[in-house]
């Protein structure tokens, strides 16, 4: 059993998505186990603390092998485990990928890391394969996350050498499409970059 856990911890799994998901419910939370800095904590502060410990950013990991379960936290009881999702795609390089929920502090960087890993592990090179990768990210995420995913995709693609598919269409046209026409603007406050 320990060897299996060690192998799972060594296995790097690309990230695929990020969206907030409750990891526990108020019914399961033991209010007496909350650390109180002062003898009396106002109800408003206590509820704010409870909400911080209940809701954690979650992202999905995707790969063709085993996935690593999210790290445990001692200050809350996790909810039921999230079952993996097998992605179906007409692109053979993405078909049969497995998406699994994971925790994320910086979703923008995690999206980029996941996309880079998928591109590297699955040898994604052509414009059509990159479009399919983006479609998979968008399909398994709620629409408020789409703008962040597209930004991460554009950032990843801007660092790739411009590949050409068999028809000679460059990726530049695809990038201009998403840069000039963002999908939505309601997640500007959730966009985190490494330059901040």
Swiss-Prot record:
Limits of the OVATE domain: 100-159
Domain of life (superkingdom): Eukaryota
Matching Pfam families: Ovate
Location in or out of the cell: Nucleus
Keyword Transcription regulation assigned: yes
Keywords: Nucleus, Repressor, Transcription, Transcription regulation
KW Manganese (keyword) present: no
Entry comment describing in which tissues the protein is expressed: Expressed in roots, cauline leaves, shoots, stems, flower buds and siliques.
GO cellular component: nucleus
Location (main, coarse): nucleus
GO BP terms, alphabetized: negative regulation of DNA-templated transcription
Annotated knockout phenotype: No visible phenotype under normal growth conditions.
Further remarks about this protein from its record: Plants over-expressing OFP10 have no visible phenotype.
Job description of the protein: Transcriptional repressor that may regulate multiple aspects of plant growth and development through the regulation of BEL1-LIKE (BLH) and KNOX TALE (KNAT) homeodomain transcription factors.
Protein name as it appears in the record: Transcription repressor OFP10
Taxonomic placement: Eukaryota, Viridiplantae, Streptophyta, Embryophyta, Tracheophyta
Gene this protein is translated from: OFP10
């Amino acid at each position: 059993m320990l060897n299996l856990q060690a192998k799972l911890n060594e296995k790097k799994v690309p990230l695929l998505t990020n969206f907030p998901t409750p990891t526990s419910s108020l019914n399961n939370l033991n209010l007496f186990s909350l650390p109180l800095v002062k003898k009396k904590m106002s109800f408003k502060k206590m509820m704010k603390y409870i909400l911080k410990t209940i809701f954690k950013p979650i992202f999905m990991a995707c790969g063709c092998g085993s996935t690593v379960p999210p790290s445990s936290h001692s200050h809350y009881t996790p909810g039921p485990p999230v079952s993996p999702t097998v992605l179906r795609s007409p692109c053979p390089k993405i078909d049969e990928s497995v998406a699994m929920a994971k925790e994320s502090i910086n979703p923008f960087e995690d999206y980029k890391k996941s996309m880079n890993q998928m591109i590297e592990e699955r040898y994604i090179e052509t414009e059509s394969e990159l479009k399919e990768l983006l479609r998979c990210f968008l399909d398994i995420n709620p629409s408020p996350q789409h703008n962040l995913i597209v930004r991460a995709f554009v950032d990843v693609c801007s660092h790739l050498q411009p590949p050409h598919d068999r028809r000679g269409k460059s990726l530049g046209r695809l990038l201009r499409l998403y840069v000039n026409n963002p999908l939505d603007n309601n997640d500007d406050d959730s966009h985190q970059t490494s330059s901040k």
